[in-house]
């Protein structure tokens, strides 16, 4: 009983079903209205600067380049710390 009532409402409310275009256009317009607009960032807005107005990303690249192989990533550092804890707890020599 509910299905014929809904179908009848769609036919009268949104246009005829024989064309099909009215329903499709309305749905696509609704979907377009729900899409968020893209945020456009300029390069100056996307990058942060320190107190001396120097680009932090460029400074970090220079620091890492100077350190060379001595620089450790966060994952490598945490793995190293975990290995040291296991050695202390288990009093076992392990290859880190």
From Swiss-Prot:
Residues 44-57 have a biased composition (Basic and acidic residues). Residues 25-72 form a propeptide. GO terms for cellular component: extracellular region; host cell postsynaptic membrane. It is found in: Secreted. GO terms for molecular function: ion channel regulator activity; metal ion binding; toxin activity. Residues 28-57 are annotated as: Disordered. Keywords: Calcium, Disulfide bond, Gamma-carboxyglutamic acid, Ion channel impairing toxin, Ionotropic glutamate receptor inhibitor, Magnesium, Metal-binding, Neurotoxin, Postsynaptic neurotoxin, Secreted, Signal, Toxin. A divalent metal cation binds at residues 82, 86. The modification 4-carboxyglutamate is found at residues 75-76, 82, 86, 95. Disulfide bonds join 83-96. Expressed by the venom duct. Pfam families: Toxin_36. Residues 1-24 form the signal peptide. Adopts an alpha-helical conformation in presence and in absence of divalent cations. Calcium facilitates disulfide bond formation of the synthetic peptide. The cysteine framework is C-C. Belongs to the conotoxin B superfamily. Conantokins inhibit N-methyl-D-aspartate (NMDA) receptors. This toxin has the highest potency for the NR2B/GRIN2B subunit, followed by NR2A/GRIN2A, NR2C/GRIN2C, and NR2D/GRIN2D subunits. This is Conantokin-E. It comes from Conus ermineus (Agate cone). The lineage of its organism: Eukaryota, Metazoa, Spiralia, Lophotrochozoa, Mollusca.
